Design a protein with these regions (language model features):
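Start-transfer (signal-anchor) and selected internal transmembrane alpha helices
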Residues: 1-46
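Short hydrophobic/aromatic helix or loop-helix immediately within or flanking a transmembrane segment
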Residues: 79-114
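Transmembrane alpha-helices of multi-pass, membrane-embedded glycan-processing enzymes
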Residues: 89, 93-100, 116-130, 172-175
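Transmembrane-helix signature of polytopic, membrane-embedded enzymes
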Residues: 131-155
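Short acidic/glycine- and proline-prone juxtamembrane loop motifs at membrane-interface regions
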Residues: 164-170
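Specific aromatic-rich, kink-prone transmembrane helix
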Residues: 171-189
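Membrane-interface alpha helices of multi-pass inner-membrane proteins
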Residues: 193-224, 240-241
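Conserved small/polar residues in nucleotide/adenosyl-binding loops
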Residues: 262-268
């Protein structure tokens, strides 16, 4: 029973990976130019923020005005922490730590910050390219209008700030736009959205921010099936995700050690 289930799972993952590549590649010359423009623009801003301010890489590990705890946690932690709001985000910390170890010899200063900001830049820039592709392939407007709308989105204050914000939001930005494009392409080509596709996207989006797991599942209501069939399919899709999160949370709970808070006690002089 178990081998057959694993075989079905791996086959589904192969199919979804193939569809993922079809959704992301190949880029057109306009998309390549759009990517390079925003990547370089955001890169210059991120470089300035990292090396000429103390907003991102706060000295002495003190909480700064720029997102305080959240930014410091995602920039400096070596992984191993579990947050129920971001159940699979520890994978990012693990990969970031490995890259930091590998690249420390090349970048003597602020290695972790460079890696994090480069990844955030790639996610936001990639999300903008997918917005352009959605406007062209799904909405089917002219290239000029698609570029205008994409450029307008790329200049939003929120988008610019996310390009140098080491947080879960850039991941969600990219994955939600990617999910919209992938689901729209499937519905446009077949007139039906498979539960397998929604399960795949729910794991991706929900793994970064747990509430995002339900967003791809909303596409079930586009299928021309009875209402209760949609509800049953939605439950079947959400159940594996919930079980997986519960197992991971249980693992971290059992592994966790009691934390001593004595080191948080401030000297009397600091309270005056």
């Amino acid at each position: 029973m178990m081998p057959s289930c694993l075989s079905i799972l791996f086959r589904a993952l192969r199919i979804e990976w193939r569809e993922t590549k079809r959704t992301l590649f190949p880029p057109t010359p306009i998309e390549t130019g759009l990517f390079l423009f925003f990547f370089l623009l955001y890169g210059c801003i991120g470089y300035r923020m990292l090396f000429h301010t103390e907003l991102i890489d706060v000295p002495n590990g003190g909480a700064g005005s720029y997102l305080g705890y959240d930014n410091l946690f995602h920039l400096h932690t070596r992984g191993g922490a579990f947050d129920i709001s971001h159940p699979f985000f520890g994978i990012f910390h693990l990969l970031k730590t490995l890259l930091t170890i590998l690249l420390t010899t090349l970048f003597k200063e602020k290695t972790s910050g460079i890696i994090c900001l480069t990844l955030m830049n790639l996610l936001i820039t990639g999300g903008l390219v997918l917005i352009y592709r959605y406007l062209k392939q799904i909405v089917r407007i002219s290239s000029r209008r698609a570029l205008l709308l994409t450029g307008f989105t790329g200049c939003f204050f929120t988008t610019v700030v996310l390009s140098f914000t080491t947080e879960s939001y850039p991941f969600s930005f990219f994955l939600l736009v990617f999910s919209l494009l992938m689901l729209s392409r499937e519905y446009m080509l077949t007139g039906y959205i498979k539960g397998r596709t929604i399960l795949f996207l729910s794991f991706l989006c929900g793994g970064i921010t747990i509430t995002n797991a339900a967003k791809p599942a909303m596409a079930l209501f586009l299928n021309k099936t009875p209402f209760w069939h949609k509800i049953r399919t939605g439950v079947k899709i959400m159940l594996p995700f919930v079980i997986c999160v519960a197992v991971i949370m249980g693992f971290y709970t059992l592994k966790a050690k009691p934390v001593s808070y004595t080191h948080l006690t401030l000297p009397t002089s600091d309270l005056v």
